[in-house]
Structure formats: structure tokens, C-alpha cells
């Protein structure tokens, strides 16, 4: 974009899938949500909400999953928020609300948020393969959607804390490294 172009954010709050190709694929949303939730709560699934529950003290286990596990959980919760926005079904919002305290408990005091690092003792930012920025990006989009659709600020505050932490880590790096 140049100085003469502008970009206005189009809130998904004004978008609804009612019929047609995608509209008809949303009719069984609770069945799909429950199926995905069951997978994310499976102790041996590569993406696990349970990792957040460990931080919250509600799950007695150790980290299990892939480097991108947190990101997959955020994408699921973001999808649920969009379904809630489209349907108004409080059962969908309750799914998201149940795991928000787990995410809050997983965030470190300095704002860092990544269970595969904090639960395993790995050094932060030591290997690009750890997908830390990938997971952060997915969290920020989930938190933004959550705030935009619900007006609730708990995830937005976590996102702000995480963004400030991330900025502090990378602010002194050369701009050429950004891509």
C-alpha cells in the first residue's frame, strides 16, 4: 500500500453463512465441533488442549504433541468463535469459554505463551523449527476474532501482553530479517 491507499477492516460480525455451498456445510456444526474437541482432548493427539490444562493445574500429564500444537488449538477455538458469531449458539461459546482460563494460566509473567517450550524446559527462540512465531500468530488471530465477536477482553489482554513481549524480543533485529 502507498500513502494514497487505505485499508478498512471488515468485521466478520457482519458476515453470515446462511445458505449455498458453505451455508449448507455449517448445519451440523456441533457434531464437527464435538469431533474436533474430542481429538484435541485425546492424550496422544499431536495437537492437544490438554497441554494448556497442565499449566492450569487441571490436567496431570506432561507435554505431548508437535511444535505447532498450540497453533492448531488456537485455530480450532477461532473457528468456534466464528461459528458462534454465525449462529449465536451459546453452547459453542461455552466450548471456547471453558479453555480460556487454561490459556491464561499458560501465559508466562513476561507475556510469553507456548506450551511446548514452557512445559519441556526448552530454551525460548533457540530453534526456528519450534514454531514459536507460528503459534503466536495463530493466537493473535484467535484473540482478535474473540474480542471482535464477543467484546470480551480477556484474550485481547493476553494478546497485548504477548505482542509486547514479542516486540521486546525482536525490536533490535535488523528490519531486513522481517519477511
Task: Describe each PLM feature range.
Residues 1-179:
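Glycan-recognition and catalytic cores of secretory/periplasmic carbohydrate-active enzymes
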Amino acid at each position: 500500500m502507498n500513502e494514497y491507499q487505505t485499508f478498512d477492516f471488515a468485521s466478520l460480525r457482519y458476515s453470515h453463512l446462511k445458505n449455498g455451498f458453505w451455508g449448507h456445510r455449517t448445519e451440523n456444526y456441533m457434531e464437527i465441533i464435538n469431533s474436533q474437541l474430542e481429538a484435541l482432548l485425546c492424550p496422544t493427539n499431536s495437537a492437544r488442549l490438554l497441554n494448556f490444562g497442565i499449566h492450569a493445574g487441571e490436567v496431570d500429564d506432561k507435554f505431548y504433541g508437535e511444535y505447532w500444537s498450540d497453533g492448531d488449538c488456537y485455530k480450532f477455538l477461532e473457528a468456534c468463535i466464528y461459528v458462534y458469531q454465525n449462529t449465536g449458539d451459546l453452547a459453542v461459546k461455552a466450548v471456547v469459554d471453558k479453555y480460556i482460563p487454561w490459556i491464561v494460566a499458560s501465559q508466562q509473567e513476561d507475556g510469553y505463551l507456548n506450551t511446548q517450550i514452557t512445559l519441556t524446559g526448552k530454551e525460548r527462540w533457540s530453534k526456528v523449527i519450534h514454531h514459536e512465531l507460528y503459534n503466536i500468530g495463530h493466537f493473535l488471530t484467535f484473540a482478535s476474532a474473540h474480542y471482535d465477536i464477543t467484546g470480551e477482553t480477556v484474550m485481547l489482554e493476553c494478546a497485548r501482553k504477548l505482542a509486547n513481549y514479542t516486540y521486546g524480543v525482536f525490536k533490535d533485529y535488523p528490519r531486513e530479517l522481517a519477511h
